[in-house]
Amino acid sequence: MAQGCIFCDIIAGKIETEFVYEDDVVVAFADIRPIAPTHLLVVPREHHATLADTVASPGGTAVLGRLLKVAGHLGAARAEADGGYRVVINNGAAAGQTVYHLHVHVVSGRHFAWPPG
């Protein structure tokens, strides 16, 4: 757990949050500032600041695999009703990362243009 990390505080139970999914590696919960009708965050229990940090860490590949597997299951559960879903990882300030604890956004329920932005 990292000092001052909101996601670490959520995982530790210091901030009350309803998990829509949890296992021994990841948790998932609704984003407090959703950009779509469905906007979930899938977060590893272990603190990794960025995608790059996770890739470089021992066991990072397994963490990433679990994040994507859970994101895929959560997205697929809503895909039929929503017509599809988007999975996003923002890595670094220039990419829009605001919480420096790796997380995957699963968003659906509205049309998303390409390119994003």
Question: What residue spans do the PLM features occupy?
Answer:
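HIT superfamily nucleotide-processing domains
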Residues: 1-117
